[in-house]
Design a protein with these regions (language model features):
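Acidic, glycine-enriched catalytic cores built around paired aspartates
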Residues: 1-265
């Protein structure tokens, strides 16, 4: 009549879970540095409360003489019904994305999609059932989160524009001017060796300049539009800046590179 011994998982696999259950507790790893864990904890507690409520209601209907056999069947059925959410691989991998799709699990790939789940009828009904939030309280929080998200995206977009225009572009322009000057001197001296390489580098630097200037114009226009346009423009600008980083002299590049941030700073 006692519960069986359940071995405790001693591995570190849960490092890839957004809120990992590590033996006797949940660890929340998805919230950002400026966010509170209170929201995820409140939601998880409400979900657990509904699960326990549903289970208690079912168990209370069992007759004492058949309680244990029915309990075993109930536990087996519950595990079978919800086993699809268990994944013991790498949650960051493409394997899990494909596996989740095969299992019919939702995959919310951006903030806007995730925010809208707050006012889904199913979720509203859950919070109202247990007196956690009313519909209007959820709608007001959704509106606040939405407004805050738009504000942050515009701030990030404006900062991306300023960094590219005032830090990256001058460094790239200087590199282009130095390369063109070296090419001009080589041609004036009627040198044949090295001029083709200088010409090729100058062309690449010039293309990178044109690309970044064009992306800056696109981002500046997007900043007056919706968040989707800003995100697309920021992504394109980032691609152009990453390409420019490979062309500029390491000593002239004004920002830390990935390898420096990972292994030096």
């Amino acid at each position: 009549d006692t519960l069986p011994v359940l071995p405790r998982d001693a591995t570190d696999r849960n490092r890839t879970s957004p809120f990992a259950f590590t033996g006797n507790k949940f660890e929340f790893r998805a919230p950002g540095s400026s966010q509170s864990c209170a929201g995820p904890m409140m939601t998880l507690n409400t979900i657990v409360a509904e699960s326990l409520d549903s289970l208690a209601e079912e168990l209370s209907s069992f007759a004492p003489e058949t309680f244990l056999p029915q309990l075993q069947e109930t536990l087996k059925r519950r595990i079978s019904e919800h086993k699809r959410i268990i994944f013991n691989g790498d949650n960051y991998s493409e394997e899990w994305v494909k596996e989740a799709e095969r299992r019919g699990l939702p995959n919310l790939k951006n903030t806007m999609t995730a925010l809208h789940t707050l006012v889904n009828e199913k979720n509203v009904a859950l919070f109202e059932k247990y007196g956690v939030f009313s519909r209007r309280e959820l709608e007001s929080r959704f509106e606040i989160f939405l407004e805050e998200y738009h504000r942050r995206i515009r701030i990030e977009g404006r900062l991306s524009w300023e960094m590219a225009a005032t830090i990256i572009l001058p460094a790239l322009r200087n590199e282009y001017e130095q390369t063109v000057s070296a090419l001009s001197r080589a041609l004036d001296a009627k040198r044949t060796s090295g001029t083709a390489a200088l010409q090729k580098l100058a062309d690449k630097l010039g293309d990178a300049l044109d690309s970044i200037v064009s992306d800056l114009d696109t981002l500046e226009t997007a900043l007056t539009s919706c968040h989707e346009d800003i995100l697309v423009a920021m992504s394109q600008l980032r691609t152009s800046v990453d390409a420019a980083e490979t062309l500029v002299n390491d000593r002239s590049w004004p920002l830390p590179k990935y390898r420096e941030m990972l292994f030096i700073y």
